[in-house]
Amino acid sequence: MQQKNKYIRIQEFLKQNKFPDFRMNQIKNAVFQGRINHFNEITVLPKSLRKLLIEEFGESILNIAPLKVQHSEQVTKVLFEISGDEKIETVNMKYKAGWESFCISSQCGCHFGCKFCATGDIGLKRNLTSDEMTDQILYFHLKGHSIDSISFMGMGEALANVQVFDALHVLTNPELFALSPRRLSISTIGIIPGIKKITQDYPQVNLTFSLHSPFNEQRSKLMPINERYPLLEVMDTLDEHIRVTSRKVYIAYIMLPGVNDSIDHANEVVNLLRSRYKRGNLFHVNIIRYNPTVSSPMRFEEVNEKQVVNFYKKLKSAGINVTVRSQFGIDIDAACGQLYGNYQKNKNQ
């Protein structure tokens, strides 16, 4: 059974105790306009109500606890403790233009076992609740950060957790975080039912598909989910998403040295995408340099920059929209595929 988010529970609590509707509005305004975290500091509420709220929900609105904060150039990574003594990580990236982007986790661990990912190596501990996902953003909001964009690209597979859709509702609710759906991004390894639900319920949310190999057999070895949802079936689902939404789909491609960075791979990516451009030039490849991890199932060599450039040029010359993604936070294990791996390794020693 899906757990109701805290904002619904607070509203129901107020109604059950016969408080007027405007009290909920006062709480929302205190949190999202005044950046107030503790019920006792919402002084527009009667003291008696504050006492009842604390007894029912605890002292603070935020229900996850920051344990460790690490800083690197343009990047902050926070390790949070959630219920059950489990841990998750969130990354804040600050761009030189002033834009702030947040990479949040949707699961504690991940059971899909992609061979290049530290998070997948620890297995799935549990799905996060809607509150645990949105609280990662609330933490930064309460500290005065500008919430410019959010990616569900942290720990876990977002579309394997049904609570993600309630989190999207909370984040886009005009009375709560009030974010435009176009400032939100969902990354998936290819969970077809989840992609279809995004198409139907959140067509303006950005969608990223983790490809990492255009060859079906190799992709199955790197990403076992390909056995359940084969590449071409996923691509057909993405075609339908584009047809319905007229929105761009991003293709993430991690360059694994000596594994998937050859010109043959580049040519096959071109073949995979170019035939689909009849619906518009709406696939965009993001090339991601492999980030070394302490505990991924397979080890890979350092990225060959020449191969990255050659791969990029091959796609570009074929008319494919392509970008080489900038790297942030590698030194604090905050980059793609690194989250939680180093903490888990240290914990087990």
Curated annotation (Swiss-Prot):
Pfam families: Radical_SAM. GO terms for cellular component: cytoplasm. It is an enzyme of class 2 (transferase). Residues 96-331 form the Radical SAM core domain. PROSITE patterns: RADICAL_SAM (PS51918). [4Fe-4S] cluster binds at C110, C114, C117. One of its GO terms (biological process) is rRNA base methylation. Binds 1 [4Fe-4S] cluster. The cluster is coordinated with 3 cysteines and an exchangeable S-adenosyl-L-methionine. Its EC number is 2.1.1.224. Its cofactor is [4Fe-4S] cluster. It comes from the Bacteria. CDD domains: Radical_SAM. Belongs to the radical SAM superfamily. RlmN family. Cfr subfamily. Reaction proceeds by a ping-pong mechanism involving intermediate methylation of a conserved cysteine residue. This is Ribosomal RNA large subunit methyltransferase Cfr. It comes from Bacillus velezensis (strain DSM 23117 / BGSC 10A6 / LMG 26770 / FZB42). The lineage of its organism: Bacteria, Bacillati, Bacillota, Bacilli, Bacillales.
